[in-house]
Amino acid sequence: MRHRNGNRKLNRTSSHRAAMLRNMANSLLTHEAIVTTLPKAKELRRVVEPLITLGKKPSLANRRLAFDRTRDRDVVVKLFGDLGPRFTARNGGYVRVLKYGFRKGDNAPLALVELVDKPAAE
């Protein structure tokens, strides 16, 4: 029985799902906004929010945890240098998921995933 099983399978093996979510989290933290399907976006939010919470407390242990989860040094540097200090006053809810229409090929529902306190576009 699937009672209380929390994560979506997204029709992938566990290793593929973990790699996909890691790559999407790296893209979101790098670009601060991405477009993906709605179920992937909702699952991505569960990956990124704890990472930003780690970035708010700059310790060596937290840096190592963040690197273990992202496997990307540039993302870790941005997380602790830019994103962590930006969200110090906010207690969670760092990621916004907005519905974004439907994909042309298969009519899959799309979502725009973005960080809440994005700097103004130039």
Curated annotation (Swiss-Prot):
PROSITE patterns: RIBOSOMAL_L17 (PS01167). This is Large ribosomal subunit protein bL17. One of its GO terms (cellular component) is cytosolic large ribosomal subunit. One of its GO terms (molecular function) is structural constituent of ribosome. Keywords: Ribonucleoprotein, Ribosomal protein. Belongs to the bacterial ribosomal protein bL17 family. GO terms for biological process: translation. Part of the 50S ribosomal subunit. Contacts protein L32. Gene3D superfamilies: Ribosomal protein L17. It comes from the Bacteria. Pfam families: Ribosomal_L17.
